Amino acid sequence: MDLKGLTAVELGKKIQAKEVTVKEAVEACFAQIDKVEKEVNSFVSLQKEAALKRAEEVQKLIDDGTLTGPLAGVPVAIKDNMCTEGVTTTCSSKILSNFVPTFSAEAVLNLEKAGAVVIGKTNMDEFAMGSTTETSYYGETKNPWNLEHVPGGSSGGSCAAVAALEVPYALGSDTGGSIRQPSSYCGIVGIKPTYGTVSRYGLIAYGSSLDQIGPVARDVTDCATVLETIASHDVKDSTSVERQDTDFTSALVNDVKGMKIGIPKDYFGEGLDEEVKKPILEAAEVLKNAGAEIEEFDLGLVKYAIPAYYVIASAEASSNLSRFDGVKYGYRTKDYEELHQMYKKTRSEGFGPEVKRRIMLGSFVLSSGYYDAYYLKALRTKALIKKAFDSAFAKYDMILTPAAPTTAPKLGASLSDPIKMYLGDIYTISVNLAGLPGISIPVGRDAKGLPVGMQLIGDCFQEKKLFQAAYTYECLTEKKWVSMYDKTETAGKGKA
């Protein structure tokens, strides 16, 4: 039986039905990894021995009826900025290359309680700072649809692993689009939940007011199932929200009749590639024909989202990353005579160029002479962006936009031009600033065969509406091309 093309829920059903053992599911993942990993480079580390041992433990719990959930026995990959007890957690940075946490992130623990089997930690942009997964200390990840292109970022390793059929689903984190943009580039489904829905305990912080953990998978059902599993109130995270409506799979209904969907005109103007625009508007037409009410409107403020985001995120990063100094854990330079010299050399040698750039920017905007001019102004802009979304959601159930302005760029195209890389997140950043949920779903491909993703944005705590609309679209289009990539046959070119 070919297991690698199954979704997480499909695989979970076969495990519960005793058609497949957990060990067979894990071995199928590693067999695919052996075939494709050298080219794709999705993983920073693999835990084969531990995963096989865990598979035996989970199998016993399934056999005796203790574990009956949809993800029991299903392999998962974890982005390498989430702590995993006893397993190296690097943030794809030299400075944490030897860091082994003594605890696991709450989201990881929730998956393990549900019977998931962690098979490895995925590659990412260093400290989640980047949009291409090219800033990793462990080398670039490549897009499984075309190995000459980036997978997006910063959760590029998680998304590439799912697209390359190395694992049924994975966890990513999203600070400014780091789940939704690579999901779009890799032709999979990814959701950033409302801020506070998933505990950030054990997530190594980048921008604490913006970071949120979410799943990436091959279809909407998997995403809803995983989010339902990892969402929980956690007293260890002061920003965690206690919700009673996290039964997200109940929203998997093929029906959008009467839903009001707004299309912001300013998201479809200059800068949007025509090969991206066309399939997204066609997808909107599919929802309209199914009974949704589609209307264009002016959202405004989108042009201010990127500058506001990079001021706020960099300011928070400069503070969060000050803890990495070589004293208690992580990399420490060998060549120093005095303590202050050790700090300086450790950080200079341990951080990559993009991380240094953002630390410098953050330190600058927080300095006494510029705090009011930049940081406070960015916070005011953030509040205005939230207000603009509030006005839109008074009229619409959700907002439909592109997930990214283009399909995946070529490797190296953005490294020499940081502004170009930052603009790759222009349609996703405002969602983080406002703390809203957003989902990216595949809707087509461009002339090169690269995937195009559509983003649906909801009001706070309205993930169910997003899942319902996304699931309806998926049903109506029969998922004709989703997960068609098979590396063993196509050598990274994708299928027509």
What are these regions (language model features)?
Residues 29, 51, 79, 111, ...:
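Conserved hydrophobic/aromatic pocket- or pore-lining residues that grip, position, or stack substrates
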Residues 18, 79, 219:
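Short, conserved phosphate/pyrophosphate- and ester-handling motifs at nucleotide-, phospho-/glycolipid
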Residues 71-91, 250-262, 315-386, 437-451:
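Short helix-loop capping/hinge segments that flank enzyme active sites or metal/cofactor-binding pockets
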Residues 25-29, 308-309, 355-363:
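Short alpha-helical scaffolding segments that buttress acidic/His motifs in well-ordered protein cores
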Residues 1-53, 289-291, 364, 482-496:
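An N-terminal boundary/leader segment
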Residues 71-213, 264-266, 315, 401-419:
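Short glycine/serine-rich loop/turn segments
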Residues 13, 301-302, 325-433, 475, ...:
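Serine-dependent amide/ester hydrolase catalytic core
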